[in-house]
Amino acid sequence: FLFFAFPHPL
């Protein structure tokens, strides 16, 4: 998923 691939702001 893109959510897991891209760095999270948290």
Swiss-Prot record:
One of its GO terms (cellular component) is extracellular region. Keywords: Amidation, Secreted. Expressed by the skin glands. The modification Leucine amide is found at L10. It is found in: Secreted. It comes from the Eukaryota. This is Novel peptide 1. It comes from Pithecopus azureus.
